[in-house]
């Protein structure tokens, strides 16, 4: 699912601060514009990937409704030359698969006889479970 949200890119000494006003002023930063965009994509994907049950995800505002001045005011900050508003887009599920790929430990039960045969044949249980889940969930 690709999502697109407006973000305020504030030019600051040493880089850019990026704020998503629609998402409770979610923020990140970068040393330069390229890094700021990459960090904006990362924080947007992380925020939307597994929201808390109580977390309200506001719909994105039209770009023309997002004000640098109003957003800066929320932080008691100024708008420096070189600041701008732009859309940031990310395919949340794809980004998560490619970048949030940390392993989690799972405890499961299988029949002893099956375990004995698998151990004898040096089966990698984690690999088999991962491959079976990918197939079962029809994930590419």
What are the language-model segments listed below?
Residues 8-22:
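Short aromatic-glycine-(Arg/Gly/Cys) micro-motifs in beta-strand/loop hairpins
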Residues 21-24, 111:
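Short, proline-centered helix/strand-breaking motifs
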Residues 30-49:
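Short, well-ordered alpha-helical segments
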Residues 135:
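Alpha-helical DNA-recognition elements
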